[in-house]
Amino acid sequence: MLKISVWHGDLSDSYLKKVTQLGVDCLDFGGGGYFPGVKEQGYPDLDALLKIKKKLSSYGLEINRVTLPDLTEKFIQGRKGGDKELANSCQALRVFGEAGLPIARQRFAGDTFPQQMRRYASSHRGGYRSRGETLARPQAAIPSPEELEKWWERFALAYSQLVPIAEESGVKLAIHPSDTPNVETPLGGLGYHRVIDAFPSRSVGYLYCCGTRAEAGGSSLVLDELHNYGRKGRILMVHLRNVRGSLATAGAFEEVLLDDGDLNPFKILLELKRVGFSGCINPDHIPAIEGDGPLVEQGLAYSVGYLKALLAALATL
């Protein structure tokens, strides 16, 4: 059964009531330092985590995905303190397992090349606002092949320690593609598939982001990858946002509301159904509609409602 997840927001009673009223099933926690305990000891406090889980349960909500403490440049460059970062991530994964949480993501510094892009606020139908990016001119330098291979070695070192813990604890490790997916980004294309080749454990899979991959090559790439990864049972959850343009076709892209871009969201859901995916779909980056504040609650309500309508239509097939 396909479910809908959204960001955790501020976890206030007001926010939790709103997402419950919208029919949301689960919450996703995207920040590696969000949970109590991370700042103090480097990893989440189990008791505090269980209290959050209990509060969400009182609204009929579950935790779908959490994020491990970040692995920063200290770890990627092999500098002092990097080993401690990995040890904290390993302990955090154990804590998430004890709390009975299903999916965890590990973030890695250096998986994107922000120096190659210029970000701006794009304006769309009626003036709603969203993220836009275009290739910077002139193009900045990117890491050398040797530096990129060194990045992969550090990634593999981290996963070689995290995967056995994931297997023991029952938590799935989900990797997100490089966003923005510039050429040669470590998780921007071929490198993304390399993860499951190197770590074939069934505890390893993808947080597949339709918007990010569309930025790389449009809707045909998204549908092909969903089929490829989905038939292998490697899609753990999905980010579903819509975009216009791509780096391949326009050297730029702009995020838009779900009905307002190049992707056909219903075709995406249909492909997910065909490959047997049964996890959560998160509308991901929410454009700001007139009157929206920091939590973009009106844009969120629109996105959740749109997804629920698509899922209702899908259920009739």
Task: Please tell me what each predicted stretch does.
Residues 8-10, 33, 110, 177-181, ...:
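Short, flexible loop/turn elements at secondary-structure junctions
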Residues 3, 62, 172:
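Residues at the starts of beta-strands that form the adenosine-phosphate
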Residues 31-156, 168, 212, 273:
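Structural motif corresponding to the early beta-alpha repeats
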Residues 1-45:
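N-terminal basic, low-complexity leaders that serve as flexible interaction/assembly modules and, when applicable
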Residues 134-150, 173-184, 289-291:
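Active-site-proximal beta-alpha loop/turn segments in soluble metabolic enzymes
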Residues 1-5, 16-23, 54-57, 74-78, ...:
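Histidine-acidic metal/acid-base catalytic patches
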Residues 71, 109-113, 178-182, 287-288:
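Short, internal active-site loops enriched in acidic
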